[in-house]
Amino acid sequence: MMLPVADAFEQANFWVVEMIGAVQFDACMRFIGENPWHRIRELRRRISTPFQVIMRSNCALNFDRQPVDINELWGELLAKSGIERVYAFDGLHDYDNTIPQLLSAKAHGA
């Protein structure tokens, strides 16, 4: 669904494109019937603008807390799919909740 506008994004010369959040993964699969990882990779091939994501605490996939290994895998998959910038925040300012996925993304090139 986003691929038809990829050329417009490329021509707009944005500084960065915010790509994905947990709810977008759910909506992409449940309502649009698309593979969100495939969509990121296809857009990465068409758009040279840096991609970024903002993750909320240790809730990478939804609004429930995820185990550390899931958050680390999430960071790895984001980087391998073409995400260059990963930001994270925690509503309680408990940054231990954000460190695993950030370190994983950094280790894999984001």
Where are these regions (language model features)?
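Short catalytic helix/loop segments, enriched in acidic residues and glycine
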Residues: 2-9
